[in-house]
From Swiss-Prot:
This is Large ribosomal subunit protein uL13. InterPro entries: Ribosomal_uL13, Ribosomal_uL13_bac-type, Ribosomal_uL13_CS, Ribosomal_uL13_sf. Part of the 50S ribosomal subunit. HAMAP family: Ribosomal_uL13. Belongs to the universal ribosomal protein uL13 family. Gene3D superfamilies: Ribosomal protein L13. Keywords: Ribonucleoprotein, Ribosomal protein.
């Protein structure tokens, strides 16, 4: 019996919705990245995008353990001397809670073109409203 290799055009993609209310950020991001990569499927192939679409709702209700709410910083650099910008997690959650979840999930995907392609299938929303009802997403529960 030969090894199975998935074909990119033969992959059937489903839509899953994850409710982030009360979930730790890391556990939510790990599970979302797992679905985006397709590791939950028996047809997983590392060099092919076999993953499904993920909708994360209630991003503003995600939690961090310990003192990370005050100590965790998001950093970016403009490339110029002295161009380091730091944003505390608490401020980011007040202004753009979707960005914190997207950043965590993106860090758990491959850092190449395939990872960028997987990242496009992630949709994050601040509250429980999302415009993807037509795709009939299944609810994915995280213990």
């Amino acid at each position: 019996m030969s090894t199975f290799f998935a074909k990119a055009n033969a992959v059937e993609r489903k839509w899953y919705v994850i409710d982030a209310a009360g979930l730790p950020l890391g556990r939510l991001a790990t599970e979302a990245a797992r679905i985006l990569r397709g590791k939950h499927k028996p047809t997983f192939t590392p060099n092919v995008d076999t993953g499904d679409h993920v909708i994360i709702i209630n991003a503003e209700k995600v939690v961090l353990t310990g003192n990370k709410l005050d100590q965790k910083m998001y950093r970016r650099h403009s490339g110029y001397p002295g161009g380091l910008k730091e944003t505390p997690y608490r401020k980011l959650m007040q202004n753009m809670p979707e960005r914190a979840v997207e950043h965590a999930v993106k860090g758990m995907l491959p850092h190449n073109k395939l990872g960028a392609q997987m990242y496009t299938k992630l949709k994050v929303y601040r509250d429980e409203n999302h415009p993807h009802q037509a795709q009939q997403p299944e609810v994915w529960t995280i213990q």
